């Protein structure tokens, strides 16, 4: 792993566009994305670069220009840049290779994607095979990670609650199975009021087929993972999968449920006894009336 740190910085200022001379992304072992916002807070520029350390100050003279707040993800020695939303987006996924000896980003290849379909993460499932979920399209692309060519597709649209996509979010591979949470959200990017549950697609990484959809309905948790946040799904020291669920982000006083659900090691089903709704748990060190929701 070459990424000792990945830092996102937001600079609250307006500025004129720089025109650096063929930026190559710099040199170093720390990968940094910086975002310069315009006064409206909804537009601006982002930059990606390597730096030798994270002390002192840096500028963007060697940084690679990105779309505004483009998601960036590192997998082994590959760095993937995903498209942002909107009319100015680059509708492709770019992959750079990190040269460990030179400490440089090299060999950019890219794969075109449909506009505004929100591919935001990539999960490696074999030596050259990876899965890319498309949040608004309701499919998972099967991709050759070396050539960045699409080799197949997994259709998840039949599992949507109401609209055309179940919103496949951020998944994890365990024992040859890809566990992919489905957010099942409405046009306001919030859970359906009549569908407060957690759905996960269980996909065989050898056949690329959906084995089943598992659902946890007991806790009334919902919105399992966000597609850009890789640490919302993880395995613990027992190899149990835990999935963080945001619900309504605490914005609905009548529905504050948020917490974790669990798929234990050796099982492909939820264990509801390990579900944990944290809305009523006082955070140690805070006022006794302060709750996570």
Model-derived features with residue positions:
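Surface-exposed loop and turn segments in beta-propeller and other repeat-based domains
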Residues: 106-115, 154-166, 210-228, 269-291
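Long, well-ordered mid-to-C-terminal structural blocks that present hydrophobic/aromatic surfaces
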Residues: 243-247, 251-293
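C-terminal motif of bacterial Sec signal peptides marking the signal peptidase cleavage site
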Residues: 11-14
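Acidic/polar, low-complexity intrinsically disordered N-terminal segments immediately downstream
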Residues: 17-114, 118-148
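Solenoidal tandem-repeat scaffolds enriched in leucines and small polar residues
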Residues: 161-224, 237
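Structural signature of eukaryotic scaffold interfaces centered on beta-propeller domains
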Residues: 18-26, 71-76, 120-125, 167-175, ...
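Short, conserved, GDST-rich strand-edge loop motifs in beta-rich repeat architectures
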Residues: 36, 179-197, 242-259
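Beta-propeller blade signature
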Residues: 45-51, 95-97, 144, 193-208, ...
